[in-house]
Structure formats: structure tokens, C-alpha cells
Amino acid sequence: MKDIINDFTLKNRNDDGNTPILNYWGANSEYGVLKDVLLGPVENYKWLKTSSVSKKTIRRNVEYNLDTAKKQYQEMISAYSSAGVKVHKHEPDPELPYQIFARDSSIMTPFGAIITNMAQWWRKGENYRAIETYNKLGIPIYDFITAGHFEGGDFNVIEPGCVLIGWEGEEGRSHFRAAQQLKQWFEKEEWEVFITDIDPYYVHIDLMVVMLAEKLAAVCLDCTDPNIVTWLKNKKIKIISVPFQETIELGCNVVALGKDRVLLPEASKTLKANLKAEGFEIFDPNLSMITQGGGGVHCMCQSLRREPV
């Protein structure tokens, strides 16, 4: 379904701000009720040395099994369906083995999709396939990141009109100049923007900080900069701490489905227990064959449409 206000366009952003909000598509938070989600394909997935996680997996000679990955992926699809979420997918490209991680090639906003600028050469083609997908769905492009490399896992909407942006520099996935470009755009839209550098070891900010519900976040306190933690607490956001080892295994990289429901990997034991104690409904597929390649459920999705909050 194309957006009622805007047809597909390659630039929906107004240079001076006040860009119109899309009528049908878009998300102004990470915790409004998720209605439509964009996933990458599993058919072309294989492990590459893309991160500290996947390098360790390959170094330890763990055997990759595509059939197992497909079964686990389908379990995740079933979880989304059970939660009432409509699933959309990128068309698989055999030259893009990390296309499964749909978080990074684009960023969905209330104003349209941002096309990012992937850092690793074997992922750059994902940006082009993302444009095709948004064209097919009739979702306008807000703009393209051009000032440097930037990946979607470093764009973290904390609450409506407020975003946390991470960057890692030349050794990582997102550059400071690109983060600044985003900051300028969103400040013109009258958003609050908090930019922070993170160690390239952690790949993206969504490894360690993810919103679960209004005023509730999962955070790895062992690896998150204290300034970020203080900033969140000053916003009266309650923090559920995720242990370092579970964080490295993508246990903090989870998806809020809205209405106190969360999708997380089966291995995320601590967060699962804490959320159940808070009264949350949990969807917890086994995704170990996928996560050992360096990405979790949050990495694998892009929220195309959430109920506004």
C-alpha cells in the first residue's frame, strides 16, 4: 500500500525542516504497536568476518547450517505473525550474504525512509536493494546519507522527537560526519539529538541500548558510556540491565512489539526473566545459527509502521 499523502520519491525531506509526516507508513518510536516490519532474506545468508562476534564464531570452527538458519528464521516469522505483525521482505540478492540484517541499509522515520551508507564493501549493495523495496512498497525516501559511512543500527529512537545516534569512526561502521549530517536534519525537524561515540568492538549502539516500552530500556551497563546512562535516567527512563556476556551474544538486541510485548532470542535469559517479572509477554525463538554471525532480532528488522505514541 503506497502512502496516501506521498508517492515514492527519492527525497521527501524539506531542507528547512517541517517535513510532512507520512499518513500510513512510519514510526515515531521503537515501542509503539508494531504493525508492519521489513526483514532481510535468509536464503543467501552465510557467516562472514564482519564483527567480533562472527570472527570468533569462524575462528572456533563452528559449523554453519543454512537449513537450521532457515528453520530458526521461520520461527521468528511465526512470532511476528502471532503478534499481529505483517512481514515484508527484501528480495534476496545472492551477492549480499548479510542482507538478512535489514536494520542497517535503511532507517524508517515518521517522514520516510533514510537510505544509509554501508561501511563494508560486501554490504554496500544492500542500500540499492533497499531503495527497490521502498519503491515497491510506495514509501518515500526521506534522504540519503552522503557525509560518510553510517548504518541503521546506530540510529536509536528513544521516544518521539528524541534520538540517540552512535558512531565508531574510521575503524567502525558509522562516521562522525555522517552522524552530524543526521543531527542537522533532525534538529531542523525539532528533534532532540544525542550523539555519542562507541567502541568499534560493539559494532552498533543497538547492541547495548534498546527501548522496550515507554520509559523502559534494556541497557548493558558494563559497556554503555555512563554519559548515555545518565542522559537516559534524566529522562526518567527505567533501565533493565543486561549482563555483558548475554549482550555480546545479542541478548540486548531485541524488538519491542508494543503493548508490553517483546521479541528476543531464546538465549537472552536475564532480560527475559526481568521482563516476565514486569508482566511482559515474551516471544523467544531460538536464533543461535543466525546470531553467531553477528546480528540479533533488532538487527534483522526495520519497523515500517508502528502506531504513533
Show where each model-derived region lies.
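The feature marks the mature, well-folded catalytic cores of soluble enzymes
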Residues: 1-309
